Design a protein with these regions (language model features):
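Short helix-loop boundary/capping segments at the starts of domains
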Residues: 14-22
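Active-site and NAD+-binding cores of ADP-ribose-processing enzymes
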Residues: 21-119
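Extended catalytic/binding region for NAD+/ADP-ribose chemistry, centered on the ART fold
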Residues: 1-15, 87-95
Length: 119
């Protein structure tokens, strides 16, 4: 999840494996709602030159948060876009079941996103 639609789009694009026959035509954008009493923890990722290249460090912070079950949601900085945040959901947290998808919108990818890659 991301705090913005643009952030979610970029995060999804970075994980796509593209070729001419398999590039996606559309995606589903979901709006998530959580009750006000559900705390969102901000994970203190050390931001420096190396943090994006050291996934073991950031994964360790995420694993520790997940296993601790302190909060149902955690806010983490995007490794792709500066000043952009992603939100992690801990499905094992007791309050996780209170978080709901309230709207889903199907949208077409703009073909210009893929033209420079020859797909």
């Amino acid at each position: 999840m991301a705090e913005s639609a643009a952030g979610a789009l970029v995060e999804s694009l970075v994980h796509l494996e593209l070729n001419e026959r398999s590039w996606p035509r559309s995606y589903d954008l979901m709006q998530i709602a959580a009750p006000d009493q559900i705390e969102i923890e901000t994970l203190n990722v050390p931001v420096g030159d190396d943090w994006k290249r050291l996934p073991i460090m950031t994964r360790g912070l995420g694993d520790e948060w997940l296993n601790s079950k302190r909060t149902a949601l955690a806010r983490v900085p995007s490794a792709i876009l500066p000043n952009t945040w992603n939100v992690l959901l801990n499905p094992e947290h007791l309050a996780g079941g209170q978080i709901r998808v309230i709207e889903t919108t199907r949208a077409d990818y703009d073909p210009r996103l893929f033209q420079k890659f020859g797909v």
